Amino acid sequence: MSPKPWKIVSSHKDRSYRVFSLRTDRAISPRTGKEHSFFILESTSWVNIIPLTSDGKVVMVRQYRHGTGEVTLEIPGGLVEEGDTPETAAMRELVEETGYTARKVISLGDVQPNPAIQNNRCYSFLAQDVRLTREQSQDEKEDIEVVLKPLSEIPEAIRNGEITHALVLAAFYRFYMEYQPGVSIHGENQK
């Protein structure tokens, strides 16, 4: 028997925080008929963007992430704010975090960050021929260093653990599947 959606019998928001809310659902399993509790992190969707310069460099950001207590190498990204489209949010995050702008972005698709406990999506984009047009405009909780990394070095940076953020890896995976089919992140080129 194929799995089916569970019937939600109750749902209530437990707490709200700046970037997410915690919700508790009670739902009935269609297979067993038993009721179970589920805890959901409700969040607005996220975006990230792979910005490429005309000379083949990826505009990346190095920043501190309090959850892991580490400084990570990532691509620009952030929240889709109310009234924004994912595309608009990606372009905004690019300019705010790096000072680079893009005239147009191309969708690389979206993923569900963790559908077991989260209700949001992460939309990834590609921007080509980005240009530095202004200074960064970081908020007071950000401390971002802009890093220009040659696109040719990205697979090795993934292999050696320099790039570890799962949503950044998903964006690069989509990019390499669509735009660089001869490049492998496993160490050998495909022919």
Residue ranges: model-predicted function:
Residues 180-191:
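Long, compositionally biased
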Residues 36, 45-48, 53, 79-166, ...:
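Unchanged
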